A protein has these predicted regions:
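Terminal low-complexity, poorly structured segments
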Residues: 11-12, 16, 47
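Intrinsically disordered, low-complexity regions
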Residues: 1-2, 17, 50, 104
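Bacterial N-terminal signal peptides that target proteins for export
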Residues: 1-12
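Compositionally biased, low-structure terminal segments
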Residues: 6, 17-18, 122, 163
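Glycoside hydrolase catalytic-domain context in secreted enzymes
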Residues: 24-257
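Hydrophobic h-region of N-terminal signal peptides that target proteins for export
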Residues: 14-24
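Helix-centric, low-specificity signal for extended rod-like, repetitive segments
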Residues: 2-3, 18, 40, 202
Length: 257
């Protein structure tokens, strides 16, 4: 139980900070103090609940208020929703969390904003061929402006998996086989999405993905295992992840399954 609590103490602040910092103007010290005080009030179930991200792409206002997800939100068992968009719908669901849950913790609303939102840009593999970091950053900036206007606060991008096996069906989601290029693009996209580190309403939180080394899945099979040496891991696959973290990415995909 103590180990679970310690893990929640590490992870939950990131989720809570991400939720609140998208629209907040508080200093990091004030925010840390606010989160510490809030976590002292949370039950273990509520802390674990912050790790839940149900998929609700087709949810409507009426369904949201009568569904099991709605009950879970009210109990503080949901940290965010995936694939729900539209300001009106998001507002109604957010009110469930803020007004009807015990602690009023707002939800995150995440979506795969991969290469544009309303304005569609070339796929990431295509963008990488330009080697134009300014244009790539601008594409992420535009996507953030459009997505945030529709209520989205979190994108599962950039995808920084180094991909060298064309049999893998997700090669087009990343920047290809070059670790250096992947690292430069990772930094550019994090800057584009997050801008001034999510201090404005038109900036959204980026999530570097997928779980490290996923681009080297055995035989190019999706969701397969990876087997490689530590030398190869650090020299060929980890550079883009490190670059995204150094650029201040707001979240990291901790698993892919």
């Amino acid at each position: 139980m103590n180990r679970i609590f310690q893990r929640m103490k590490q992870v939950a602040p990131m989720l809570l900070f991400a939720t609140l910092s998208v629209h907040a103007q508080k200093s990091p010290q004030d925010m840390n103090r606010f989160i510490d005080n809030l976590m002292k009030k949370m039950t273990l179930e509520e802390k674990i609940g912050q790790l839940n991200l149900p998929v609700t792409g087709e949810i409507t206002t009426g369904q949201a208020k009568s569904s099991d997800i709605s009950a879970r939100i009210k109990r503080g068992e949901v940290g965010g929703l995936f694939n729900l968009k539209g300001v009106a719908r998001i507002k109604d669901v957010q009110e469930l969390a803020v007004k009807e849950s015990r602690l009023g913790i707002p939800l995150l609303f995440g979506m795969d904003v991969i290469h544009g939102y309303e304005t569609i840009f070339p796929i990431p593999l295509g963008l990488s061929c330009t080697w134009d970091m300014k244009a790539i950053e601008e594409s992420a900036r535009i996507a953030a402006i459009e997505a945030s206007a529709d209520g989205i606060s979190w994108t599962f991008s950039p995808m920084v998996d180094v991909s060298r096996d064309p049999r893998w069906g997700r090669v087009s989601e990343g920047s290809g086989e070059d670790p250096f290029l992947g690292a430069e693009i990772a930094k550019a996209m994090v800057r584009g999405y997050q801008g001034g580190q999510m201090k404005r309403n038109d900036e959204i939180m980026a999530c570097v993905k997928h779980f490290a080394l996923y681009g080297a899945s055995e035989a190019g099979r999706d969701y397969n295992t990876v087997d490689m040496s530590r030398q190869r891991m650090f020299n060929e696959y980890m550079l883009p992840y490190q670059a995204a973290v150094d650029a201040g990415v707001g979240s990291v995909m901790a698993s892919i399954n």
